[in-house]
Amino acid sequence: MSLMSSVRPSLSIGIEEEYQTVDPVTRDLRSHIHAEIVQKGKLLLAERVKPEMHQSVVEIGTGVCQNIQEAKDEIRDIRQQIIRLARQNDLRLAAGGTHPFAQWREQEIYPDDRYRTIVEDLKMVARANLIFGLHVHIGVEDRETAIQLMNSARYFLPHLLALSANSPFWVGMETGLRSYRCKVFDKFPRTNIPDLYQSWSEFENYVNLLIHTNCIDNAKKIWWDIRPHPYFPTLEFRICDMPMRLEETIAIAALCQAIIAKLYRIHEQNLTFRHYSRSLIMENKWRAARYGLDGKMIDFGKQTEVPARQLIEEILEFVSDVVPELGSREEIAYIRRIMEHGNGADRQLRVFHETGDLKKVVDYMIEETEYGLFAPAFTAAGEGQ
Protein backbone atom coordinates (compact mmCIF):
# COMPACT_ATOMS: atom_id res chain seq x y z
CA MET A 1 0.00 0.00 0.00
CA SER A 2 1.33 3.43 -0.95
CA LEU A 3 2.18 5.81 1.89
CA MET A 4 1.95 8.81 -0.40
CA SER A 5 -0.46 11.66 0.23
CA SER A 6 -3.32 12.34 -2.15
CA VAL A 7 -2.07 15.93 -2.40
CA ARG A 8 -0.64 16.33 -5.87
CA PRO A 9 2.88 17.77 -6.04
CA SER A 10 3.17 21.17 -7.69
CA LEU A 11 6.12 19.98 -9.84
CA SER A 12 7.53 23.50 -9.68
CA ILE A 13 11.11 23.91 -10.90
CA GLY A 14 14.14 25.60 -9.38
CA ILE A 15 17.58 25.49 -11.01
CA GLU A 16 21.02 26.17 -9.55
CA GLU A 17 24.10 26.52 -11.77
CA GLU A 18 27.74 26.83 -10.70
CA TYR A 19 30.08 28.78 -12.99
CA GLN A 20 33.85 28.99 -13.21
CA THR A 21 35.40 32.47 -13.08
CA VAL A 22 38.23 32.48 -15.61
CA ASP A 23 41.13 34.82 -16.38
CA PRO A 24 40.75 35.76 -20.08
CA VAL A 25 44.53 35.79 -20.64
CA THR A 26 45.76 32.70 -18.80
CA ARG A 27 42.42 30.83 -19.06
CA ASP A 28 43.09 29.62 -15.52
CA LEU A 29 40.59 30.03 -12.71
CA ARG A 30 40.74 33.37 -10.95
CA SER A 31 39.13 34.58 -7.74
CA HIS A 32 36.09 36.79 -8.19
CA ILE A 33 36.58 38.40 -4.75
CA HIS A 34 38.42 41.55 -5.83
CA ALA A 35 36.09 42.04 -8.80
CA GLU A 36 33.19 41.84 -6.31
CA ILE A 37 31.17 39.76 -8.76
CA VAL A 38 28.91 38.35 -6.04
CA GLN A 39 28.36 41.71 -4.34
CA LYS A 40 27.68 43.51 -7.62
CA GLY A 41 25.60 40.58 -8.80
CA LYS A 42 23.37 40.86 -5.74
CA LEU A 43 22.62 44.48 -6.67
CA LEU A 44 21.34 43.26 -10.04
CA LEU A 45 19.94 39.86 -9.15
CA ALA A 46 19.42 39.90 -5.36
CA GLU A 47 19.72 36.45 -3.80
CA ARG A 48 19.91 34.72 -7.18
CA VAL A 49 23.73 35.09 -7.01
CA LYS A 50 25.80 33.44 -4.27
CA PRO A 51 29.44 32.59 -3.57
CA GLU A 52 30.56 28.99 -3.23
CA MET A 53 33.32 27.45 -1.14
CA HIS A 54 36.12 28.25 -3.61
CA GLN A 55 36.62 31.86 -4.65
CA SER A 56 36.61 30.89 -8.34
CA VAL A 57 33.03 29.59 -8.22
CA VAL A 58 29.87 31.65 -8.62
CA GLU A 59 26.49 30.02 -7.99
CA ILE A 60 23.23 31.32 -9.41
CA GLY A 61 19.73 30.10 -8.73
CA THR A 62 16.25 30.76 -10.03
CA GLY A 63 13.22 31.42 -7.92
CA VAL A 64 10.35 28.95 -7.80
CA CYS A 65 9.26 28.53 -11.42
CA GLN A 66 5.85 27.12 -12.31
CA ASN A 67 6.95 25.61 -15.62
CA ILE A 68 10.04 24.98 -17.71
CA GLN A 69 9.52 28.03 -19.93
CA GLU A 70 9.59 30.29 -16.88
CA ALA A 71 12.77 28.58 -15.68
CA LYS A 72 14.38 28.98 -19.10
CA ASP A 73 13.58 32.68 -19.24
CA GLU A 74 14.99 33.22 -15.76
CA ILE A 75 18.19 31.26 -16.37
CA ARG A 76 18.73 33.11 -19.65
CA ASP A 77 18.32 36.46 -17.92
CA ILE A 78 20.67 35.51 -15.07
CA ARG A 79 23.31 34.13 -17.45
CA GLN A 80 23.20 37.27 -19.57
CA GLN A 81 23.56 39.61 -16.61
CA ILE A 82 26.26 37.69 -14.75
CA ILE A 83 28.31 37.17 -17.94
CA ARG A 84 28.13 40.91 -18.69
CA LEU A 85 29.16 41.68 -15.13
CA ALA A 86 32.09 39.28 -15.32
CA ARG A 87 33.31 40.81 -18.58
CA GLN A 88 33.04 44.32 -17.17
CA ASN A 89 35.40 43.15 -14.42
CA ASP A 90 37.91 41.43 -16.75
CA LEU A 91 36.68 37.90 -16.10
CA ARG A 92 34.96 35.24 -18.17
CA LEU A 93 32.46 32.60 -17.09
CA ALA A 94 32.78 28.99 -18.17
CA ALA A 95 30.40 26.12 -17.50
CA GLY A 96 31.77 22.63 -16.91
CA GLY A 97 31.98 20.01 -14.20
CA THR A 98 35.71 20.67 -13.72
CA HIS A 99 38.22 23.18 -15.07
CA PRO A 100 40.58 21.46 -17.54
CA PHE A 101 43.86 22.39 -15.85
CA ALA A 102 43.32 24.50 -12.71
CA GLN A 103 45.16 23.30 -9.61
CA TRP A 104 42.95 22.96 -6.56
CA ARG A 105 45.91 23.63 -4.26
CA GLU A 106 46.09 27.19 -5.60
CA GLN A 107 42.44 28.04 -4.92
CA GLU A 108 41.41 30.25 -2.01
CA ILE A 109 38.42 29.47 0.18
CA TYR A 110 35.63 32.05 0.33
CA PRO A 111 35.72 33.92 3.67
CA ASP A 112 32.58 32.54 5.26
CA ASP A 113 32.05 30.71 8.56
CA ARG A 114 30.10 27.88 6.92
CA TYR A 115 32.88 27.12 4.45
CA ARG A 116 35.57 27.44 7.11
CA THR A 117 33.70 24.87 9.18
CA ILE A 118 33.45 22.45 6.24
CA VAL A 119 37.18 22.79 5.50
CA GLU A 120 38.04 22.31 9.16
CA ASP A 121 35.90 19.17 9.24
CA LEU A 122 36.87 17.60 5.90
CA LYS A 123 40.38 19.05 5.43
CA MET A 124 41.95 18.21 2.06
CA VAL A 125 38.80 16.48 0.87
CA ALA A 126 37.02 19.85 0.99
CA ARG A 127 39.93 21.86 -0.42
CA ALA A 128 40.23 19.51 -3.39
CA ASN A 129 36.51 19.70 -4.15
CA LEU A 130 37.00 22.12 -7.06
CA ILE A 131 33.92 21.03 -8.98
CA PHE A 132 30.85 22.60 -10.56
CA GLY A 133 27.37 21.11 -10.67
CA LEU A 134 23.80 21.58 -11.80
CA HIS A 135 21.09 21.10 -9.17
CA VAL A 136 17.43 20.80 -10.13
CA HIS A 137 14.62 21.19 -7.58
CA ILE A 138 11.19 19.72 -8.34
CA GLY A 139 8.31 20.74 -6.09
CA VAL A 140 6.99 17.83 -4.02
CA GLU A 141 5.32 19.40 -1.02
CA ASP A 142 4.26 16.31 0.92
CA ARG A 143 7.27 14.78 2.68
CA GLU A 144 5.99 11.20 2.57
CA THR A 145 5.41 11.52 -1.15
CA ALA A 146 8.89 12.98 -1.60
CA ILE A 147 10.53 9.94 0.02
CA GLN A 148 8.56 7.47 -2.09
CA LEU A 149 9.31 9.36 -5.30
CA MET A 150 12.99 9.61 -4.36
CA ASN A 151 13.10 5.83 -3.96
CA SER A 152 11.82 5.38 -7.50
CA ALA A 153 13.76 8.24 -9.11
CA ARG A 154 17.13 6.82 -7.97
CA TYR A 155 17.06 4.43 -10.94
CA PHE A 156 17.27 7.31 -13.43
CA LEU A 157 20.23 9.12 -11.86
CA PRO A 158 22.99 7.41 -13.91
CA HIS A 159 21.16 8.25 -17.13
CA LEU A 160 21.03 11.92 -16.13
CA LEU A 161 24.75 11.77 -15.36
CA ALA A 162 25.50 10.29 -18.79
CA LEU A 163 23.60 13.15 -20.45
CA SER A 164 25.24 15.89 -18.38
CA ALA A 165 28.79 14.47 -18.14
CA ASN A 166 31.11 17.43 -18.72
CA SER A 167 34.33 16.90 -16.77
CA PRO A 168 36.86 14.79 -18.69
CA PHE A 169 39.93 16.69 -17.39
CA TRP A 170 41.40 17.16 -13.93
CA VAL A 171 44.45 19.29 -13.00
CA GLY A 172 45.72 19.20 -16.59
CA MET A 173 45.20 15.49 -17.24
CA GLU A 174 42.80 13.64 -19.48
CA THR A 175 41.19 11.34 -16.93
CA GLY A 176 39.67 8.74 -19.24
CA LEU A 177 36.29 9.44 -17.61
CA ARG A 178 33.47 11.51 -19.04
CA SER A 179 32.56 12.74 -15.54
CA TYR A 180 35.51 13.03 -13.20
CA ARG A 181 33.57 15.53 -11.11
CA CYS A 182 31.47 12.82 -9.50
CA LYS A 183 34.61 10.89 -8.50
CA VAL A 184 36.02 14.00 -6.81
CA PHE A 185 32.78 14.53 -4.92
CA ASP A 186 32.59 10.86 -3.90
CA LYS A 187 35.35 11.63 -1.38
CA PHE A 188 32.84 13.60 0.68
CA PRO A 189 30.86 11.66 3.28
CA ARG A 190 27.13 11.08 2.77
CA THR A 191 27.25 11.25 -1.02
CA ASN A 192 26.24 9.03 -3.95
CA ILE A 193 23.00 7.11 -4.43
CA PRO A 194 20.81 7.06 -1.30
CA ASP A 195 19.50 3.90 0.26
CA LEU A 196 15.83 3.00 0.10
CA TYR A 197 13.70 4.56 2.83
CA GLN A 198 10.34 3.03 3.66
CA SER A 199 8.89 6.25 5.08
CA TRP A 200 9.61 9.86 5.94
CA SER A 201 9.90 8.90 9.60
CA GLU A 202 12.65 6.40 8.77
CA PHE A 203 14.55 9.14 6.94
CA GLU A 204 13.97 11.56 9.84
CA ASN A 205 15.31 8.99 12.28
CA TYR A 206 18.46 8.68 10.16
CA VAL A 207 18.97 12.46 10.10
CA ASN A 208 18.33 12.80 13.83
CA LEU A 209 20.80 10.03 14.61
CA LEU A 210 23.51 11.83 12.63
CA ILE A 211 22.77 15.10 14.39
CA HIS A 212 22.66 13.56 17.86
CA THR A 213 25.97 11.76 17.30
CA ASN A 214 27.72 14.91 15.99
CA CYS A 215 28.14 13.62 12.43
CA ILE A 216 26.32 16.68 11.06
CA ASP A 217 24.71 19.80 12.48
CA ASN A 218 21.99 20.02 9.83
CA ALA A 219 20.52 17.93 7.03
CA LYS A 220 22.12 20.06 4.29
CA LYS A 221 25.29 18.08 4.95
CA ILE A 222 23.63 15.02 3.46
CA TRP A 223 24.95 15.40 -0.08
CA TRP A 224 23.24 12.53 -1.92
CA ASP A 225 22.73 12.52 -5.69
CA ILE A 226 19.05 13.10 -4.97
CA ARG A 227 17.61 14.23 -1.66
CA PRO A 228 14.52 15.75 -0.10
CA HIS A 229 15.71 19.28 0.51
CA PRO A 230 15.77 20.00 4.25
CA TYR A 231 14.43 23.56 3.94
CA PHE A 232 12.46 23.65 0.68
CA PRO A 233 9.48 21.43 -0.24
CA THR A 234 11.39 19.89 -3.14
CA LEU A 235 13.20 16.84 -4.37
CA GLU A 236 16.68 17.98 -5.39
CA PHE A 237 18.55 16.24 -8.21
CA ARG A 238 22.27 16.79 -7.53
CA ILE A 239 24.00 14.23 -9.75
CA CYS A 240 24.55 16.34 -12.87
CA ASP A 241 27.76 17.97 -14.06
CA MET A 242 27.34 21.61 -14.98
CA PRO A 243 26.38 21.69 -18.70
CA MET A 244 27.76 24.32 -21.04
CA ARG A 245 24.75 25.47 -23.04
CA LEU A 246 21.58 26.96 -21.61
CA GLU A 247 19.56 24.52 -23.72
CA GLU A 248 21.32 21.55 -22.11
CA THR A 249 20.52 22.76 -18.61
CA ILE A 250 16.88 23.29 -19.51
CA ALA A 251 16.53 19.93 -21.29
CA ILE A 252 17.92 18.07 -18.29
CA ALA A 253 15.76 20.05 -15.85
CA ALA A 254 12.68 19.32 -17.97
CA LEU A 255 13.54 15.62 -17.95
CA CYS A 256 13.90 15.65 -14.15
CA GLN A 257 10.46 17.23 -13.87
CA ALA A 258 8.94 14.73 -16.30
CA ILE A 259 10.43 11.76 -14.42
CA ILE A 260 8.88 12.91 -11.14
CA ALA A 261 5.54 13.65 -12.84
CA LYS A 262 5.48 10.20 -14.41
CA LEU A 263 6.43 8.41 -11.21
CA TYR A 264 3.71 10.26 -9.32
CA ARG A 265 1.16 9.26 -11.96
CA ILE A 266 2.19 5.62 -11.59
CA HIS A 267 1.77 5.77 -7.82
CA GLU A 268 -1.50 7.68 -8.19
CA GLN A 269 -2.85 4.72 -10.17
CA ASN A 270 -1.83 2.33 -7.37
CA LEU A 271 0.85 0.85 -9.61
CA THR A 272 4.45 0.37 -8.58
CA PHE A 273 7.79 1.24 -10.15
CA ARG A 274 10.27 -1.41 -9.21
CA HIS A 275 12.93 -0.32 -6.73
CA TYR A 276 16.51 -1.44 -7.27
CA SER A 277 19.25 -1.69 -4.71
CA ARG A 278 21.82 1.04 -4.25
CA SER A 279 24.59 -1.38 -5.22
CA LEU A 280 22.99 -2.09 -8.61
CA ILE A 281 22.35 1.57 -9.37
CA MET A 282 25.96 2.34 -8.43
CA GLU A 283 27.11 -0.01 -11.21
CA ASN A 284 25.26 2.12 -13.74
CA LYS A 285 26.57 5.31 -12.14
CA TRP A 286 30.15 4.11 -12.64
CA ARG A 287 29.44 3.28 -16.28
CA ALA A 288 27.89 6.71 -16.82
CA ALA A 289 30.90 8.44 -15.24
CA ARG A 290 33.39 6.35 -17.18
CA TYR A 291 31.79 6.17 -20.63
CA GLY A 292 29.02 8.77 -20.71
CA LEU A 293 26.70 8.27 -23.66
CA ASP A 294 29.11 5.95 -25.46
CA GLY A 295 28.93 3.09 -22.97
CA LYS A 296 26.42 0.46 -22.04
CA MET A 297 24.28 0.40 -18.93
CA ILE A 298 22.52 -2.47 -17.25
CA ASP A 299 18.83 -3.03 -17.88
CA PHE A 300 18.12 -4.57 -14.49
CA GLY A 301 14.74 -5.94 -15.51
CA LYS A 302 16.17 -7.81 -18.50
CA GLN A 303 19.50 -8.46 -16.76
CA THR A 304 21.46 -7.42 -19.83
CA GLU A 305 23.67 -4.59 -21.09
CA VAL A 306 22.05 -1.98 -23.31
CA PRO A 307 23.65 1.05 -25.03
CA ALA A 308 23.16 4.16 -22.91
CA ARG A 309 21.52 6.07 -25.75
CA GLN A 310 18.95 3.30 -26.20
CA LEU A 311 18.04 3.33 -22.51
CA ILE A 312 17.69 7.12 -22.56
CA GLU A 313 15.38 6.80 -25.58
CA GLU A 314 13.31 4.38 -23.52
CA ILE A 315 13.13 6.96 -20.73
CA LEU A 316 11.92 9.58 -23.21
CA GLU A 317 9.18 7.17 -24.25
CA PHE A 318 8.42 6.39 -20.60
CA VAL A 319 7.69 10.06 -19.80
CA SER A 320 6.07 10.94 -23.14
CA ASP A 321 2.49 10.85 -21.82
CA VAL A 322 3.16 13.49 -19.12
CA VAL A 323 5.16 15.86 -21.32
CA PRO A 324 2.16 17.53 -23.04
CA GLU A 325 0.62 18.41 -19.67
CA LEU A 326 3.95 19.85 -18.50
CA GLY A 327 4.36 21.83 -21.72
CA SER A 328 7.96 20.72 -22.12
CA ARG A 329 7.94 18.89 -25.45
CA GLU A 330 10.38 21.27 -27.14
CA GLU A 331 12.75 21.37 -24.17
CA ILE A 332 12.87 17.59 -23.75
CA ALA A 333 13.35 17.12 -27.49
CA TYR A 334 16.79 18.72 -27.01
CA ILE A 335 17.86 15.53 -25.20
CA ARG A 336 18.06 13.85 -28.61
CA ARG A 337 20.34 16.63 -29.84
CA ILE A 338 22.67 15.96 -26.91
CA MET A 339 22.70 12.27 -27.82
CA GLU A 340 23.41 13.08 -31.47
CA HIS A 341 26.16 15.67 -30.98
CA GLY A 342 27.63 14.42 -27.71
CA ASN A 343 27.53 15.58 -24.13
CA GLY A 344 29.87 18.29 -22.88
CA ALA A 345 32.70 15.85 -22.18
CA ASP A 346 32.54 14.48 -25.73
CA ARG A 347 32.79 17.98 -27.15
CA GLN A 348 35.60 19.07 -24.81
CA LEU A 349 37.58 15.99 -25.79
CA ARG A 350 36.96 16.67 -29.47
CA VAL A 351 38.48 20.15 -29.13
CA PHE A 352 41.45 18.83 -27.18
CA HIS A 353 42.19 16.01 -29.62
CA GLU A 354 42.01 18.47 -32.52
CA THR A 355 44.21 21.15 -30.91
CA GLY A 356 46.22 19.47 -28.15
CA ASP A 357 45.68 22.66 -26.15
CA LEU A 358 43.68 22.79 -22.92
CA LYS A 359 43.47 26.58 -23.19
CA LYS A 360 41.52 26.06 -26.42
CA VAL A 361 39.19 23.80 -24.47
CA VAL A 362 38.58 26.61 -21.97
CA ASP A 363 37.91 29.02 -24.86
CA TYR A 364 35.37 26.54 -26.22
CA MET A 365 33.69 26.22 -22.81
CA ILE A 366 33.36 30.01 -22.57
CA GLU A 367 31.88 30.20 -26.08
CA GLU A 368 29.39 27.43 -25.34
CA THR A 369 28.39 29.03 -22.02
CA GLU A 370 27.52 32.22 -23.91
CA TYR A 371 25.96 30.40 -26.89
CA GLY A 372 22.71 31.94 -28.08
CA LEU A 373 22.60 34.54 -25.32
CA PHE A 374 23.95 37.57 -27.17
CA ALA A 375 24.28 39.06 -30.61
CA PRO A 376 27.50 37.92 -32.34
CA ALA A 377 29.04 41.37 -31.87
CA PHE A 378 29.07 40.87 -28.09
CA THR A 379 31.66 38.11 -27.99
CA ALA A 380 33.56 39.43 -30.99
CA ALA A 381 33.98 42.85 -29.43
CA GLY A 382 34.47 41.51 -25.91
CA GLU A 383 31.93 43.88 -24.37
CA GLY A 384 33.02 45.44 -21.13
CA GLN A 385 36.74 44.98 -21.66
Swiss-Prot record:
Gene3D superfamilies, A to Z: 3.30.590.20
Similarity-based family: Belongs to the glutamate--cysteine ligase type 2 family. YbdK subfamily.
Taxonomic source organism: Solibacter usitatus (strain Ellin6076)
Protein's name according to its UniProt entry: Putative glutamate--cysteine ligase 2
EC number: 6.3.2.2
A Gene Ontology biological process term: modified amino acid biosynthetic process
Keyword ATP-binding annotated: yes
Keywords: ATP-binding, Ligase, Nucleotide-binding
One MF annotation (Gene Ontology) recorded for this entry: glutamate-cysteine ligase activity
UniProt superkingdom: Bacteria
NCBIfam families: gshA_cyan_rel, PRK13515.1
HAMAP family attached to this UniProt entry: Glu_cys_ligase_2
Function field: ATP-dependent carboxylate-amine ligase which exhibits weak glutamate--cysteine ligase activity.
Lineage: Bacteria, Pseudomonadati, Acidobacteriota, Terriglobia, Bryobacterales
Catalysed reactions, semicolon-separated: L-cysteine + L-glutamate + ATP = gamma-L-glutamyl-L-cysteine + ADP + phosphate + H(+)
